[in-house]
Amino acid sequence: MRLILLGAPGAGKGTQANYIREKFGIPQISTGDMLRAAVKAGTPLGLEAKAIMDAGGLVRDDIIIGLVKERIAQDDCANGFLFDGFPRTIPQAEAMIAAGVDIDYVVEIDVPDAAIVERMAGRRVHLASGRTYHVTFNPPKAAGKDDVTGEDLVQRDDDKEETVKKRLAVYHEQTAVLVGFYGKLAESGSAKAPKYVKIDGTRAVETVRDDVLKALGA
């Protein structure tokens, strides 16, 4: 099972990725984790990536693809893998195909922007304990206060509406185009084309999970 999970920040990809990992016994691979592991291991690609990052640059696609090929050759990928947050752009997707990295499924968790803003901007956190609330979906007993300690809840900077909207804008500009790319690839009928699956992510987590696993033949 080799798949790519797509979806905007806040669409619930992380939760669904955990279900998929557990069901199929495959690792979840993110470019950030790959880069950190390669830098730590001191591999040639890792050292090259570190030099670029230390200079404040963006790691080139050819290095990323090289790291991907190294990573998926490891033993824990024998049954497949789940790419989270990769590829981010069409050039990366094309480079992956050119490098012979085959994918079985592309799964998009689809949630409208307005629903994501409501989800994320409504989050409140008790920093000391990590307890999380939502002003609409999981409100504290007393507005703005932690249920256990009575201490103030805060809104993380990442959850502020303007920040969420900026992240969504970046997603639509860079990554959402992949949805169209993989959709067309699936329609092309090419033997190498992955199956493209779009799942409504606005429903209960368990319902989304069941639909995802069903689409993957589980």
From Swiss-Prot:
Domain of life according to the entry: Bacteria
CDD domains, per the entry: ADK
InterPro entries linked: Adenyl_kin_sub, Adenylat/UMP-CMP_kin, Adenylat_kinase_CS, Adenylate_kinase_lid-dom, P-loop_NTPase
One Gene Ontology CC term in the entry: cytoplasm
Annotated binding of AMP, by residue: 31, 36, 57-59, 85-88, 92, 156, 167
Physiological role: Catalyzes the reversible transfer of the terminal phosphate group between ATP and AMP. Plays an important role in cellular energy homeostasis and in adenine nucleotide metabolism.
Protein name: Adenylate kinase
Underlying gene: adk
